[in-house]
Amino acid sequence: VLIKPDKDILEKIKHLPFDYYQIYDCTPEEIKEIKQKYNKKIITALTIKDEKDVEKYQSFLEVTDIYLFDSKGYEKSMAFDHSLIEKIKINKPLMIAGNIQVNDNLENYNKIADIIDISGGLETSGVKDKSKIDIFLNKIEQVKNET
């Protein structure tokens, strides 16, 4: 995860075997430059509060490989209305994050996103919780078997 990365950071990590850079707070022009210079696929992270924020995805069409719609503030406890991205129809994978919890209805997310970032939702007191991970994996299997 890179938040408005500067050249020093990019130079330090350029030899690491990342397939993707997940980038927050950059313009399409900055992302294009990073993508070309470092030959990496890009996950463009857009922080969402309202429909106006969602519409920003259009300016990144040429430079992103995966869209990540996340809540404002990079905080695990914050959420946004995931239904705001239901209308997006593009030929690129959509990922959602933002206070997704293990007990949420995964079918709802399955309808609007290709990838779910539930990282914080699988934690208890800041540590990955095996029981939550098991519950989540079982729920994924159920959704897969129903579709």
Can you say where each PLM-predicted feature lies in the sequence?
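Catalytic beta/alpha-barrel core
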Residues: V1-D6, L10-E33, K40-S59, D65-M78, ...
